[in-house]
Structure formats: C-alpha cells, structure tokens
C-alpha cells in the first residue's frame, strides 16, 4: 500500500458549530490596554467587531499609578470577556528612577502574579542600561521570569553591537521598537522576534516591509 496509509488522525475534542462561522482572528501582541482610556469591557466592544480576538497587554501605566492593585483590577476586569486577554507583567515601575509614580515594584512584588494562568511573561524591558550593566534589580526580574519559564519582551530602539549582544543574551526575546531595517536586522540576526506595527501611534510597516520575504 501507500506509505503512511495506515496512519490515522483522531480528534481529541470536537466542537459542533451548529451553523456558526469559523474564522481566524487578529492577535494584538503588544498593547497597554488602559491607554485606550476606557474600561476593558468597552475596549472589547470597539475592537472585537474589527476582528481582534486576542490581546497581550502590559498594564504598566495603571500599575505606575496604583501599584499591584492596578494589576489585580485588570485581571478582574478582563475575566469572561469575548476577547482573550493575556498579560505581560510590568518590568519598569517606575519607568525611570526620576519618576514620581504611585508605586515602586521590585521582582518580589510581581513574582506571585506568574501563577496566574493568563500571564505570559515579563513585559517590555525598557531598562536596557540596567540589563547591559547587570543591575541587580533588573537581573532579578529577568531571572524570576525565567524561573517560571515565561517569555521576556524587549524595548530597545537603536541598540547595537556588544550592548545588543548582552541584552539579547540576557533572555530578551522580542522587540517592538524597530524603526529601521538596520535595527530590525541586527536583532533578527541575534534571534529576536521583531514586531511590525501600523497603528494609531506607532507605524513601522513601510520601513520593515522588506523583512516580509522568504529570506527572513
């Protein structure tokens, strides 16, 4: 008989659509949901009709104001919504040491949140200087995320050379801030995933479109 003719694929789970329509949805891989200035429920009302079915949000803005209470609120407010809301935990609260924010979160403050099933990892590590120069608090946050087998998003526009080598080697696996092909290629060559954005505030599709070839 034909090679593989004895192979059989068995379903594990069957969903009866009962006349429904099955279609793919968009995934927004990086967002600060609270930046929309509406509640998560209202955000879903605006985005779901346009095909967005999953968002991965970093609640660092509300956390800069409310501390861990802000994270708790976002978890509760996104339960049971028709959009799948996943979380990356804020890595830089405050965003800089000069900020007068409502909270100062070290790795201990966010560590327990890794047990939440919708948490995917550590959000954009904006403190590239701290990563490169082995800042103990920054390293502790990275190590804690890795200990939970979670991903670490990056935020390092224009970082090059040995500094970029160090940043990526620390475990930062993605970047959404590439504005030029040179920047994107340097990070791709080191194994990072590159996000292409064409939204209201950030647009790099035209600059990075040449990446969308079989070569890359």
Model-assigned labels for residue ranges:
Residues 23-30, 57-60, 88, 123, ...:
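Active-site neighborhood of phospho(di)ester-bond hydrolases with catalytic His/Asp-centered motifs
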Residues 36-38, 63-65, 201-202:
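Acidic-and-aromatic substrate-binding clefts and catalytic sites of carbohydrate-active enzymes
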Residues 41-149:
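Divalent-metal coordination cores built from histidine and acidic residues
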Residues 12-13, 20, 83, 150, ...:
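A structural micro-motif
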Residues 28-39, 94-107, 173, 177:
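Active-site mouth loops of central-metabolism enzymes
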Residues 104-124, 130-196, 200-216:
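Histidine/acidic residue-rich metal-binding segments in metalloenzymes
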Residues 2-9:
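Short, small-residue-biased leader/transition segments that mark boundaries at the very start
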């Amino acid at each position: 008989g034909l090679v593989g003719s004895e192979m059989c694929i068995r379903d594990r789970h069957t969903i009866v659509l009962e006349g429904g329509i099955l279609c793919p949805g968009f995934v927004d891989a990086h967002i600060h949901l609270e930046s929309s200035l509406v509640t998560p429920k209202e955000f879903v009302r605006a985005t779901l009709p346009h095909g967005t079915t999953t968002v991965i949000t970093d609640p660092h803005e509300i956390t800069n104001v409310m501390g861990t209470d802000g994270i708790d609120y976002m978890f509760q407010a996104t339960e049971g919504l028709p959009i799948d809301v996943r979380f990356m935990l804020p890595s830089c609260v405050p965003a800089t040491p000069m900020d007068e924010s409502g909270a100062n979160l070290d790795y201990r403050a966010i560590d327990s949140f890794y047990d939440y099933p919708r948490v995917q990892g550590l959000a954009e590590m904006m403190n590239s200087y701290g990563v490169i120069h082995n800042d103990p608090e920054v390293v502790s946050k990275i190590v804690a995320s890795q200990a939970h087998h979670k991903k670490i998003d990056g935020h390092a526009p224009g970082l090059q050379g040995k500094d970029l080598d160090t940043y990526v080697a620390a475990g930062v696996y993605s970047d959404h801030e590439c504005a030029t092909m040179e920047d994107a290629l340097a990070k791709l060559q080191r194994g990072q995933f590159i996000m292409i954005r064409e939204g209201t505030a950030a647009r790099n599709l035209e600059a990075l479109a040449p990446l969308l070839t079989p070569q890359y």
